Amino acid sequence: MSGENVEVARGLFPPGRELDGPLIAGHPDMVRDLFEPLIAENFSVTFVAAGLTTTNRGPAAMSEATRDYMDAFSEHCSVFDRHIDGGDVVVALGRQHGRAHHGGEFDEETGLVFFFDPNGKLARIQGYQRWREALEAAGLSE
């Protein structure tokens, strides 16, 4: 099942593809339709931005979390280059860059941890601002 989990993570966050956060946040129905068949009943997403942590739950969690996260930025793009297989957990590592409403331009590490249930459904996505934090949360190392 772990290889399938990596493919799910890569399908949602393709390696090397620049993801325009505000554009994605502006299409909540598209995001919900993409995620809904892949998620467990208790699905949640947690992101941290500018010291604010938000957690959203349910079928609309990813679109709501993306919208909430993007509220901190006037411009934002992410690119994930690596997807690390940890069995029931997959870590996507990349960079995010753009301009925050408060604090100016940034270019920094970012990591997402995808937690899967025993049936291969996404149970949770947790965002981290440092690769090390994402790897530790997944019980992995580089």
Each language-model region and where it sits:
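C-terminal and inter-domain tail/linker signature
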Residues: 1-142
